[in-house]
Amino acid sequence: HRSETITSPSKLEDFIAVLRFLSSKKNKRVVLSLHPNTMDNLRKRGLKMPKNIIISPPFKFTDYVFLMKNADLVFSDSGTLAEESSLLNLKAINLREEQERHEAMDESATILVGFNKDRILDAVDFYEKRNGNQENLNSTVQDYEVSNFSEKMVKTVISYTDYVNRIVWQR
């Protein structure tokens, strides 16, 4: 759903080619959750999907988490994939050229591959060689193991409300 993904014909076509390959050669059913803009771009380009690729509008977050937890492998360009992969112990391939979650990269929570077909397939092969072993796939990223996170966030919001109103919104 990222703009650099859906506005780049080559990235979109490379990704669809990988999905076609995986769905046919690996005999896997693929659930592809697409934002409306991405769906429009697929239609405009006339890109067709095999029958075992199920296209769906975006899921509610709880349904999306359920789907990820029960997937053999998760591909996403989402900014939150690092957290989800770390906390849910997912086999995750991050379809971005870069990411803001450096702490997750330092602890290898995902495999960052961009849209290069060969790199994506290398990541798939890496996970397949684990023979389905999910145990200890990811250790939780240390920065995500904060026991009183909610309390800290409330204190931060309270602390910065006046500052943001004054400096950002000039109220």
PLM region descriptions:
Residues 2-171:
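Nucleotide-activated sugar donor-binding and catalytic core shared by glycosyltransferases
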